[in-house]
Regions:
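Conserved SAM-binding loop
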Residues: 2-9
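A short SAM/SAH-binding and catalytic strip from SAM-dependent methyltransferases
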Residues: 24, 33-49
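Conserved class I S-adenosyl-L-methionine
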Residues: 61-96
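Conserved SAM-binding strand-loop segment of SAM-dependent methyltransferases
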Residues: 11-25
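Short alpha-helix
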Residues: 88-111
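Local beta-strand N-terminus motif with an aromatic residue
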Residues: 15, 32-33, 60
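Class I S-adenosylmethionine-dependent transferase superfamily signal
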Residues: 54-56
């Protein structure tokens, strides 16, 4: 993903610099920038307050986070219900992240939009999709046919609701 960002920025003639590592662990090595961008990682951050604060501390003008409105694997919730009769959590959400940003004193704006390419970006063979879902669902290989049938019912090719959370510094 970072390589794709680098390529796109270079192609557009945008000055950019990437830093690999966990945020805010690498913050001390990262210079302040006009715009700080964070793409599809917020749901995996254990300590969100220091994460957001470090983003803000490194931006001169703006902080931009792009993320889905709900957890990236929430599309599997119906499968958890089907196979385990479990109702998966519906939180956290992007709205809650925006509330946290505002509670920190940032004037967070949440722009919601549809990602029309969701479900079409990576064309995995069905057996790989089944394997991934089976492992995520903690099922044994002998359930592959059931998993495949469930996936065929919901190929998840509909647009996904995502957002851009941003604030000026």
């Amino acid at each position: 993903m970072l390589d794709a960002y680098t390529e796109a920025a270079t192609k557009r003639g945008v000055q950019h610099q990437e830093f690999r590592g966990s945020w805010p662990d690498v913050a001390a090595n990262v210079p302040v920038a006009d715009v700080v961008v964070c793409h599809h990682v917020a749901f995996n951050v254990a300590a969100i307050v220091p994460f957001l604060q470090a983003l803000n501390d490194h931006a001169r003008r703006r902080v931009v986070l792009e993320l889905p409105m709900t957890h990236p694997l929430s599309n599997m919730s119906p499968l958890w219900k089907k196979f385990w009769d479990l109702d998966r959590p519906t939180t956290p959400t992007a709205h809650q992240l925006a509330d946290i940003a505002r509670a920190l004193g940032f004037d967070g704006h949440l722009d919601v939009w549809a990602d029309e390419t969701w479900g079409q970006r990576v064309s995995l063979p069905m057996e790989e999709r089944v394997r991934f879902a089976r492992i995520r669902l903690c099922l044994s290989e002998d359930r592959d046919a059931e998993v495949a049938a469930a996936l065929i019912q919901d190929l998840d090719a509909t647009p996904r609701e995502v957002c851009t959370l941003w604030w000026d510094v």
